[in-house]
Amino acid sequence: MALEDMDKKYRISDIARELQVSPQEVLRFVKQEGARVASTSSMVDTEMHGLILGQFSDEKKMVDETRKIRAEKKQRLNRLEEQSRKTVEKEDQLRDTLQPSPVPGRVEVPVPAPIEAPVAAPVVPDAPVAPVEVVPPAPPEAPLMAEAAVEAEPEVAPPSLEAEEDSPVEAQANDQIVSYDAPKNIGGLTVLGTLDMESESDRKRRGKKKNFKESADALKDEFDTTGSVELDDDGKPKKKPGSSPLGSDLGMGKKKGKKKKKPEVDEKVISANIRSTISGMDVGAGSGSRSKFRKQRKMEREHEQEEADAFREMQQQVVRVTEYASPHELAELMSVTAKDIIQKCFTLGKFVTINQRLDKESIELIALEFGYEAEFVSEVEATEVVAEVDNEEDMDTRPPVVTIMGHVDHGKTSLLDYMRNSNVAGGESGGITQHVAAYEVTGSNGRKITFLDTPGHEAFTAMRARGAQVTDIVILVVAADDSVMPQTIEAINHAKAAGVPIVVAINKIDKPEANPEKIKTQLSEAGVLVEEWGGENQCQEISAKKGTGIVELMEKVLTEAEVRELKGNYSKEVLASGVIVESELDKGKGVISTVLVQRGFLKVGDPFVAGNTMGKVRAIMDERGKRIQSAGPSRPVSVLGFEDLPQSGDVLTVMASDREARDLAQKRQVIRREHEFRRSTRVKLDSISRQIKEGLMKELSVIIKADTDGSIQALADGLMKIQNDEVKVQIIHQGVGQITETDVLLAAASDAIIIGFRVRPNVNAKRLAEKEDLDVRFYSVIYHVLEDVEKALEGMLSPELHEESLGSLEIRQVFKVPKVGNVGGCYVLDGKILRDAKVRLLRDGVQIYDGTLDTLRRFKDDVKEVDAGYECGVGLKNYDDIKVGDVVEAYRIVETKRKL
């Protein structure tokens, strides 16, 4: 058992989560201790685990203390809620206890204004008298309110609050001196305390209120039928001489005092007494249940700890692995030896070596055998670099990244063109933006804005989606003389999915047919409600050609940025990171990528990794081609120094050294190569077997060469959309750069066509293509590519067949011709009968033959056609069973070209 504990492995990220500290801090400590670890996903042994716990013991104590404080706070809130609930219940109990039903024969002690002499009242034996209302005090002492207790909610004061409540109660008590005299000769009406005249309901109620019975009895002994009830300085009742004591409930007294006017009651004082009394009761109850609360708090802590342990254990049972991992890599992730993995494969009937790549099904099966669940991730996710936590002092306001979206030709590039004061659209083919371009614009107040100009047509759906992932604000451009198009709604959906606020720019308001209100109505139907109509989206009417409203639009964008409080890490010590917006292959400079820096400063000479490639920054240029030495957050720059072409959307991360960058890139390349090799082999075999089974699938093989990676992705997405189940586009190769001999040879071997988008073939490739008679097409606008490929696919579709009726004839006589068979003498009822038409023979409306004509004669001559109203002779091919009255229908099958 001890050996198993020594061999146990711990993941650094799990230890950091347990200690509530940054994984990078734990990683740095482990490296300082001399352990060889690559990332926070690496495993450490039990000894290192103990060192980590010792190093971060203060943090662990702080975490435990924080959890303890939170639990106690939660208990305190629950206890206050319970006390509040009990307070309401006890107030109801006091009302029921101290307000009994009136009983005949009771004597009422009215509380008049202060008087000096006692007031005598004649005895009226038979009249029912209101009872004397007694306020039972809670121990140790409480103020008495005689008549006031009937009007308000009676209560007793706690000992802790006695001093605070004495003064108002005494003032009230001094004004409420009540006295009455009884005749001296009451003739044996002395109450011995054994007769109770209460009603049955009152007796039951008094039996339930045991807590107040003793205090009530104590007060009764202090009253006398002939005395007066007074309150002394301490708020206790004074005794006065009398001939007869008061009974248990004063029920034996047959006297009726003179009824006096009731004094006004101070509701505020009584309410304060009630609250203070209940508070005192609750304090006593709470202190008595302190041990119970401790036990409950301990149980809840144990329950929370059990839940946390269960969640941590569940997380540890999930292993994140790439597809086609080796037994050695799988063993490291599951904290077992490679020997155990290989032995388990043998038992499953798989013979593998330590470095052999396993397929997805095998990895899932092996993980289940060891009690793990396999979660497959991409090669980039498996080797992602965990960024350090940003320090608050390094954060500062950064320029907003704004994406301009909208439909084709609604004026997106013209808007950016006006703001940059340069002719951007002039450099694009057909005035249509073909790339995602990033530009930095300085406003009138000196504040900068970074713009991403995405193409508007639907071929660039993926490019527009990538733009929305890195953007902070979206400017949605809609032409006032047009309407909200499907691509506009698509852009709205992309922005909403990314959680990005939208600022609406209604363009072309200078045109006479402009109708901004119609655009606002259509936008509201699409889920974008402008501020003028009570929505959250800012709106500005502009004219990109004349510059109307451009300044106001930029101010609204900056206002939106201020609301979002956009900040970036401007520390020069932190390792920079950014996103690849676009990449292309230049003949003289090599790979050039447009990078949007998101964190830190990207400097010349920094080693980096981006996707599956790595490199070292050789040069940094702004959007106008001017060389700079560094670039901060939200600044778009062109970077030189990539070893290979990265993909748009890849994350560029600066590494500490060239070796780290190269190792990480090579690891990703190995996983990617293995994945593509396995996938391509499987897809080819599957496609072959599927085509053998179906025999109907037709493919148009295509090789795409373009000037940028973004254009390739847009072309591929557009081509995949126009296929169906019968014909499809098979992209066998795609790449950036000019068309080479290798591309031509691949096209010749695969019977493919080559599409060059804004690129040309070299001399040798051109000669080889002419020799092989290959179809090489060149385009500069994506629309034309999609149209031509769609036409090609439509030509590969099987034509749609439908029947066209030509005419019908009736057999009126049957002739038997030697060596020929039966021939019908017919009359053409309608239409026209053609010699080469298909016919069907109908008898009583039922088809009994379907074929072709053998002979068609008029008189003795063979003819090609016979019109309606004429007679003719007809013979059916290989069929003689014709009778008088049969009908022959002539028809032909017409083929119609199908469209996708």
Swiss-Prot record:
Q: Where in the cell is it found?
A: Cytoplasm
Disulphide bonds in the chain? none
Ranges for the region named G1 are: 406-413
UniProt keyword Nucleotide-binding, yes or no: yes
Biased segments, Basic and acidic residues type: 80-95
Q: Where is this region: G5?
A: 543-545
> Where is region (G3) located?
453-456
Task: Could you list this entry's UniProt keywords, alphabetically sorted.
Answer: Cytoplasm, GTP-binding, Initiation factor, Nucleotide-binding, Protein biosynthesis
Q: Where is the composition biased (Basic residues)?
A: 253-262
Signal peptide limits: none
Q: Which InterPro entries match?
A: EF-G-like_DII, EFTu-like_2, IF2_II, IF2_N, P-loop_NTPase, Small_GTP-bd, T_Tr_GTP-bd_dom, TF_IF2_bacterial-like
Give me the ranges of the annotated region Disordered: 80-106, 149-169, 221-268
Q: Region G4: which residues?
A: 507-510
Provide the coiled-coil residue spans: none
Please list where the region (G2) is annotated.
Answer: 431-435
**Gene3D superfamilies from the xrefs?**
1.10.10.2480, P-loop containing nucleotide triphosphate hydrolases, Translation factors, Translation initiation factor IF- 2, domain 3
Domain spans labelled tr-type G = 397-567
Q: Which GO terms describe its cellular component?
A: cytoplasm
Q: What does this protein do?
A: One of the essential components for the initiation of protein synthesis. Protects formylmethionyl-tRNA from spontaneous hydrolysis and promotes its binding to the 30S ribosomal subunits. Also involved in the hydrolysis of GTP during the formation of the 70S ribosomal complex.
Task: Report the sequence similarity comment from the record.
Answer: Belongs to the TRAFAC class translation factor GTPase superfamily. Classic translation factor GTPase family. IF-2 subfamily.
Its protein name is Translation initiation factor IF-2
Tell me the gene name. Answer: infB
